[in-house]
Amino acid sequence: MARKTWMYAVLEAVQYEMRQDKDMIWIFELTPPVASNPGKPVINLEKEFGRKRVVNTGIDEYWMAACTLGAGLAGSKAVTYIPYQGACMPFELIQNEAGKLRHMSGGQAEMPVVFIMEMTGQTPGFAGQHSDYEIDTYYAHIPGVKTVIPSTPADAKGMMVSAIRDPNPVVYLWPDGLRELVEEVPDEQYTVPLDKAAVRTSGNDLTIVSSGAGMPEVLAAADQLQKAGMKVEAIDLRSLKPMDTETLVKSVQKTKRLLTFDQSYYTLCPGAEVIARVAENVDGARFKRIAFPDAPPPASPEMFLWMKPNAGHIVNLAKKLVG
């Protein structure tokens, strides 16, 4: 057990799996799979496994995804890291091929591939084209593809192991704003389920649900509300599909109030699906959601921060909802 960054925890998981499986490959562009951590050896996948297994491609995200998918169909586990500039480029391939081929083969063709999609978290100053967070909903809508979004280094490692070992294609959403987040992470290899939400704080007054880069804001708000006497149950989705409906319903049956918080756009955000599932199963509950406005993120940091949902918005709406 040691304090590790998100990046180090993920590459530690990949390194172990590549050592166990000599056919497993990693495909990337621009960003080399290298990570350092205080008191730990540097991880450099390309140096350890060579360029035949750790492939630095040209800048073509569609091609990267196609090679990853082809490797999986041929029997090799494969992971590709697609940076934020191209996170939407492989959509057609994942939607039309990765999400369907296993079903079209009657389950005979396994697809042990992981598509890591970097999300900028709508970083101030990146402007509209490279600042979007809405790919969470895009990929979660694809049948046959699991879509996960960890919010902590410990979950990031365990969910990466589970994703690599899963026979189905997994879109692994990577909130870039959490890259340098540090926490205690076990040294040994372990798994975190790809279909279970995590209850981060327990309470009876209000359920707040979020995922990925939204969770730090939710936990900050929950702390403020706790000091004001409100007992909040904060739930980290971790997996957008399959979504852990059971945990959501159980919580709202207790609190009777649900607030969802998303960094992605308001229309059809993950919170909308959360509310729909709870509404189908819990009578008499009250609902509210917070999300980014349906508008491209501006380049101006000041304008962007004015639009971005934050802990203050959660606190204000939570008090009105519980009121």
Question: Which sequence ranges carry the predicted segments?
Answer:
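Thiamine diphosphate
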Residues: 1-169, 173, 178, 305-306, ...
